[in-house]
């Protein structure tokens, strides 16, 4: 696969994630869009690491760290959402202002 195809796909995924994150009112949908953004960044890291410096695996190793962070976010995010939905009876972002009591 050519470099341009992978970069266009990554930019497309990143754009979908940003659009969904900005327009989403649901916390679960926002978490899914954040995962799309992280996956697009991982695609860029691996692609540029493979294209520019094939001997050193800096992009691949950094991508593994990003995957670990995404896994932690995927584990903790739904727990936070379920806690908020239990307390506030809603998972809408605009109704979950926890600083105002």
From Swiss-Prot:
Example GO biological process: ATP synthesis coupled electron transport
Location within or outside the cell: Plastid, Chloroplast thylakoid membrane
Catalytic reaction(s) noted: a plastoquinone + NADH + (n+1) H(+)(in) = a plastoquinol + NAD(+) + n H(+)(out); a plastoquinone + NADPH + (n+1) H(+)(in) = a plastoquinol + NADP(+) + n H(+)(out)
GO MF annotations in UniProt: oxidoreductase activity, acting on NAD(P)H, quinone or similar compound as acceptor; quinone binding
Transmembrane domains' residue ranges: 2-22, 32-52, 61-81
Keyword Transcription regulation: no
Enzyme Commission identifier(s): 7.1.1.-
Membrane topology term: Multi-pass membrane protein
UniProt xrefs under Pfam families: Oxidored_q2 (PF00420)
InterPro entries: NADH_UbQ_OxRdtase_chain4L/K, NUOK/Mnh_C1-like
The entry's keywords: Chloroplast, Membrane, NAD, NADP, Plastid, Plastoquinone, Quinone, Thylakoid, Translocase, Transmembrane, Transmembrane helix, Transport
GO cellular component: chloroplast thylakoid membrane; NADH dehydrogenase complex
Coiled coil: none
Keyword NAD listed: yes
Major subcellular site: plastid
The organism's place on the tree of life at top rank: Eukaryota
PANTHER family, A to Z: NADH-UBIQUINONE OXIDOREDUCTASE CHAIN 4L (PTHR11434:SF16), NADH-UBIQUINONE OXIDOREDUCTASE SUBUNIT ND4L (PTHR11434)
Subunit comment: NDH is composed of at least 16 different subunits, 5 of which are encoded in the nucleus.
Function: NDH shuttles electrons from NAD(P)H:plastoquinone, via FMN and iron-sulfur (Fe-S) centers, to quinones in the photosynthetic chain and possibly in a chloroplast respiratory chain. The immediate electron acceptor for the enzyme in this species is believed to be plastoquinone. Couples the redox reaction to proton translocation, and thus conserves the redox energy in a proton gradient.
Family, per entry: Belongs to the complex I subunit 4L family.
Name of the featured protein: NAD(P)H-quinone oxidoreductase subunit 4L, chloroplastic
The species this protein was found in: Lotus japonicus (Lotus corniculatus var. japonicus)
Gene label: ndhE
